[in-house]
């Protein structure tokens, strides 16, 4: 006769009923919690219905006091009181009248239209360093000066070559090695070398 397998549903029902009975026996009242901070001050966060517990005493034998620590508020840069002091600092706005007048003028200079000349005293300078020597100038033409050339020079745009110092080109001299050939010059047998190669 084959062995009867126990039905899994009946086994689960038996365990579930035992668990339900054990849960029903527990008290539904909230636990008494005593909160202690790290600096020694005590605070009571228990429910308003339950009486306040004394220090080191237990209200019930079943529900002991659970001591929890109070969270501390810290900052990553400095302590909390220093952060409050810095936030309460008020700057002295009674500055000099000259400094109050200079700042709007700087802002006024910076906010200008593209076609408006703000800094008229500056000299325009061509800073194209790819061509240091201007194309329209020749070294021979600089020797012969006249009144017309001087007037054109004053009107023309200054070049970067006028302000840059002349640097001599650097030449890296590599000496060639001295070869010593050690053999006696004589007639060479080309046909004999050809026969030795291909025979």
From Swiss-Prot:
Transmembrane segments: none annotated. GO terms for biological process: centriole assembly; centriole replication. Pfam families: PPP1R35_C (PF15503). It is found in: Cytoplasm, Cytoskeleton, Microtubule organizing center, Centrosome, Centriole. Participates in the later stages of centriole assembly through the interaction with Ana3 leading to the centriole to centrosome conversion in somatic cells. Interacts with Ana3; this complex is recruited to daughter centrioles before their conversion to centrosomes. This is Protein PPP1R35 homolog. It comes from Drosophila melanogaster (Fruit fly). The gene is Rcd4.
């Amino acid at each position: 006769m084959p062995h009867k397998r126990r039905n899994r549903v009946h086994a689960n029902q038996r365990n579930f009923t035992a668990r339900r009975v054990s849960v029903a026996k527990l008290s539904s009242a909230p636990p008494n919690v005593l909160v202690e901070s790290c600096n020694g001050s005590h605070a009571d966060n228990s429910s308003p219905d339950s009486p306040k517990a004394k220090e080191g005493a237990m209200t019930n034998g079943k529900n002991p006091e659970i001591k929890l620590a109070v969270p501390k508020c810290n900052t990553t840069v400095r302590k909390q009181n220093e952060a409050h002091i810095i936030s309460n600092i008020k700057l002295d706005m009674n500055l000099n009248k000259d400094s109050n007048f200079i700042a709007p003028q700087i802002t006024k200079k910076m906010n200008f239209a593209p076609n408006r000349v703000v800094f008229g005293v500056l000299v325009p300078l061509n800073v194209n360093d790819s061509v240091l020597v201007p194309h329209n100038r020749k070294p021979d033409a600089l020797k012969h000066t006249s009144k017309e050339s001087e007037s054109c020079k004053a009107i023309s745009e200054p070049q970067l070559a006028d302000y840059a110092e002349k640097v001599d080109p650097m030449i890296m001299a590599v000496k060639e090695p001295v070869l010593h050939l050690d053999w006696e010059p004589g007639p060479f047998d080309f046909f004999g070398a050809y026969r030795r190669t291909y025979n």
